[in-house]
Amino acid sequence: MDVKAPRGTNDILPPVSLKWQYIEDTARRIFQMYNYKEIRTPIFEYTELFQRGIGETTDIVEKEMYTFEDKGGRSITLRPEGTASVVRAFLEHKIYGQVQPTKYFYIGPMFRYERPQAGRFRQFHQLGVEAFGSNDPALDAEVIALGLDILKRLGLTDVEVFINSIGCPECRARYSDELKQYLESHQDRLCKDCKARLNKNPLRILDCKNEECSLVIKNAPKILDYLCDNCRVHFEDVQEYLDLLGIKYRVDPTLVRGLDYYTNTAFEIKFKELGAQDAIFGGGRYNGLTEEIGNKSIPGIGFAVGIERLILALDKKGIKLPVNDSIDVYLVTIGERAKRAAFNYTYLLRESGITAEIDYLGRSIKSQMKSADRTGASYTIIIGDSELDSGKATVKNMRTGEQVEIMLANLIEEMQKLV
């Protein structure tokens, strides 16, 4: 047996897992500040949900989904993104009947079959938000501000915000016709994938990173010139709210995102040092998605951020997160009677909120002290038969080397004072 993880997956081990915990805890605090509540959905859904929600002509649905047939003959897919599942839950549980807006956040693994590379895996992790029940452009600005707040708390401020409006289905259809005509006149310059997209979904071509395609796209019609009055005013209002918050942004008329459900506002937060795959956050409005999935017309907006890519950006920037994997106390024991007593003290210390460890390998005092040093223990408590007989233990400050004796009867209270 080849004992290794499947290609495109990654074990997250200490101390790296501490970074993940810090990022997730930071995000949770900010979600709470913005009144977003956690939702947890299954990691697999019926395949039709993603076909209808994401769009059958998207790269995700056509090429990247992990789809299989279960023992009941049902087509099941591991979720490639989070929004469709949250929308399904919102509709299934009739949350739309409650007071709106409804604000959710989620954190969890997603799955896409694509070529593994820096910051991209076949099992990857996202944290994201979804807000339902309001078409207020102020909510669009809030979602963008929330994403920036997370990055700011993590120390990543050297980012750029890009926004666009891809309109409603009516004005987007007019634009799509004009774009298709233009692209057909330059079809010989398009890459193989874009030629295939031309008849299926020409807007996807705007997202192509191929150099020659980018040159063609540069002179293509701009969707902002085709917005209806309502969509134009909505986009102008979004910009005004961003201005009100002092958020700097750039309007990018080629920004369409890779999913079919987006309407009106689309945005990305980019960190240019990541190269071609520089988008950390991505999101936008999806006012037609609830109707596409469940025949209920309810506006929605959200974003997702890839945690692996976020950590890559933090590492590129040299940002050291304030994580701590050290412990407060390591109990060094001499003899079996002392070990039994120390085992109980270890439990009592933990119960009082102190992180504590004890030797489980029967090592010498010297080896136990080395182990205490490796764990980053702030203090060691040395307990042997003589300490039990005298009712006193030796406590050593591992930073200064200072040693003091304390009464075993007061051990917990005294250690609480020290740590």
UniProtKB/Swiss-Prot annotation:
Main location: cytoplasm
InterPro entries: aa-tRNA-synth_II (IPR006195), aa-tRNA-synth_II/BPL/LPL (IPR045864), Anticodon-bd (IPR004154), Anticodon-bd_dom_sf (IPR036621), His-tRNA-ligase (IPR015807), HisRS-like_core (IPR041715), HisRS/HisZ (IPR004516), HisRS_anticodon (IPR033656)
Catalytic activity: tRNA(His) + L-histidine + ATP = L-histidyl-tRNA(His) + AMP + diphosphate + H(+)
Superkingdom assignment: Bacteria
Annotated keywords: Aminoacyl-tRNA synthetase, ATP-binding, Cytoplasm, Ligase, Nucleotide-binding, Protein biosynthesis
Molecular function as annotated in GO: ATP binding; catalytic activity, acting on a protein; histidine-tRNA ligase activity; transferase activity
Gene Ontology CC entries for this record: cytoplasm
Top-level EC class: ligase
Entry keyword annotation includes Nucleotide-binding: yes
GO biological process: histidyl-tRNA aminoacylation
Pfam hit, one: tRNA-synt_His
HAMAP family on file: His_tRNA_synth (MF_00127)
Record's protein name: Histidine--tRNA ligase
